[in-house]
């Protein structure tokens, strides 16, 4: 399952929508909830990012992300 993680680069400042960035993770999970938990844990262990939201991408949404050219999987 591919998850899109929305985050701020630092926890030091208040989140601002215009500074929100995203990364994509391929997570092996039995359920959507388990995948969200694993994704948050991975990001928190490997970065200082402030995670805002984690979204499971549907096939159509994933295709759209690939078409726009912003899709690249992040590996830790």
Swiss-Prot record:
Residue ranges crossing the lipid bilayer per the database entry: none
Described purpose of this protein according to its UniProt entry: A non-essential component of RNA polymerase (RNAP).
Entry coiled-coil feature ranges: none
Keywords: DNA-directed RNA polymerase, Nucleotidyltransferase, Transcription, Transferase
Keyword presence, Nucleotidyltransferase: yes
Known catalytic reactions: RNA(n) + a ribonucleoside 5'-triphosphate = RNA(n+1) + diphosphate
Family, similarity comment: Belongs to the RNA polymerase subunit epsilon family.
Any one Gene Ontology cellular component term annotated for this protein: DNA-directed RNA polymerase complex
Annotated protein name in UniProt: DNA-directed RNA polymerase subunit epsilon
Species in which this protein is naturally found: Streptococcus equi subsp. zooepidemicus (strain MGCS10565)
EC number of the protein: 2.7.7.6
């Amino acid at each position: 399952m591919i998850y899109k993680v929305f985050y701020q680069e630092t926890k030091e400042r208040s989140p601002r929508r215009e500074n929100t960035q995203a990364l994509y993770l391929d997570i092996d999970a039995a359920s959507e909830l388990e995948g969200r938990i694993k994704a948050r844990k991975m990001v928190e262990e490997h970065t200082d990012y402030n995670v805002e939201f984690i979204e499971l991408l549907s096939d159509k949404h994933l295709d759209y992300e690939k078409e726009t050219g912003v899709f690249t999987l992040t590996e830790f």
